[in-house]
Amino acid sequence: VSAGGEAKALSLLYTDAAVKGYRLFNIDESFEDVTNLYDINQHPNEVLTVDPVLYDALKKVSDANCREIYLGPLYASLENLCASNDDAAAAQFDPNRNDAAAEETAAVAAFTQNPDDISLELSGENQVCLHVSDAYQAYAAEMGYTAYLDFFWMKNAFLIDYLADTIRGEGYQLGIISSKDGFVRCLDETGEKEYRYPLYHLSGNEIQSYGTMTYEGPKSIVFFHAYQAGSPDAYRYYQYQDKTMCTPYLSAADGKDHTAASELIV
């Protein structure tokens, strides 16, 4: 196979996997060829058969007792906050600055914390049931919620893993797959090549380069940052005029952002 032919084959493989991943984790619309997260949200208390990729992702968060996946309504509010044109508009969605937003956040967090109100049942053979109590369904209908479940900031972590596993499964074992929000998978198992990952730090209002991390061999890397680091972050972060920053890392304990560091790499 020529280099051009191999590049074309890899491009098609990546594109097909990326399209499938986008559809599986989509919370806004349904697709004929897959049962996705949107379908699960629209059919609470029904058993659905999903793709193994989505089943595996749901099982991982469920096994880890990661209840942040149930904060779908609050992630939607955060996106509205971050899309605001000014502080006054943003504050309407901010539980730390608006009483109505605080009340809504507390209510969703209370539902999120209680497995009797919302939980996932994963019964094997890719069968999933999102259990939602009558009380939560009534509240969601009153508030106009469209998604109980949302991977939100975690989504690209699972997409990167899926893309990496798909590509490696076809024999491609050199190179890196990364997302602009800080998720990285290195495919190279040879250990013969050194890779570099640039590190940044927010100093005042300026994002500065402060070093480079080098590594070898297969790695999974996550670089969390508590500030907007480019246009893809536009709907995940908001900075008020007083420099207060809102980030996407909401806690299931109270539905609020408690980010304490400007960067974290794991």
PLM regions: where:
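Mature catalytic core of soluble alpha/beta enzymes
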Residues: 1-266
